[in-house]
A protein has these predicted regions:
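Bacterial Sec-dependent N-terminal signal peptides
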Residues: 1-27
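N-terminal "domain-start" segment that seeds a small globular fold
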Residues: 22-48, 158
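Short active-site neighborhood of thiol/selenol oxidoreductases, capturing the structured segment around
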Residues: 46-70, 75
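Hydrophobic beta-strand anchors of alpha/beta hydrolase catalytic cores
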Residues: 57-58, 87, 136
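Active-site-proximal beta-strand/loop segments in catalytic clefts of secreted hydrolases
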Residues: 60-62, 90-93, 116
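Structural microenvironment flanking redox-active thiols in thiol-disulfide oxidoreductases
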Residues: 67-106, 120-125
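Short, internal strand/loop/helix patches
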Residues: 100, 104-141
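Thiol-/selenol-based redox modules, centered on thioredoxin-like
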Residues: 132-159
Length: 159
């Protein structure tokens, strides 16, 4: 009996010890490291890892999803007013010309806007679990997601 208790206690100690030293898994949820994101715009190639040490708001949007488009506009205006926040907006429209027109019409900051389609869009949707809707992720200076679809007040409090 003592041997069985010792084995169970040793196993429990081993599990607790190993879990204490594991890094957080990368996943698109609060408390997890944000999945990396590689984006291109013209000759410019950007990665989410390039923004380590900064607070970043990643917005996924489309012209067909009104809520995501409204959020993109709000977050873009917020980032324009506060230098402590970096905004990366990723658009999934199938028509890149439409994307360009919306950026102009909505007076969005073009340098923070990226258009993706095809396989690249499918991979991003998979990595960020966007199969049930487009979301925004507030990422802290350590690359950890601190909020999903935050309101402006939440973003301001995180800065």
């Amino acid at each position: 009996m003592k041997k069985a208790i010792l084995i169970i206690a040793s196993f429990a100690f081993l599990i607790i010890t190993l879990s204490a030293f594991n890094d957080r898994t990368t996943a698109p949820g609060v408390g997890y490291n944000a999945p990396d994101l590689f984006l291109t715009s013209g000759d410019n190639v950007s990665s989410l890892k390039d923004y380590k040490g900064e607070t970043v708001l990643v917005t996924f949007w489309s012209s067909g999803d009104a809520l995501s488009r409204i959020r993109c506009n709000e977050y873009s205006a917020l980032a324009d007013r506060d230098d402590r926040l970096r905004h990366i907006a990723v658009n999934f429209d199938s028509n890149e010309a439409l994307f360009g027109e919306i950026v102009k019409r909505d007076n969005l900051t073009a340098s923070e806007q990226y258009h993706v389609d095809g396989e690249r869009a499918a991979q991003i949707r998979l990595n960020y679990h966007l199969d049930r809707g487009l979301h925004s992720f507030l990422i802290d200076k350590n690359g950890v997601i601190v909020a999903v679809d935050p309101d402006v007040e939440h973003v301001n409090n995180a800065l």
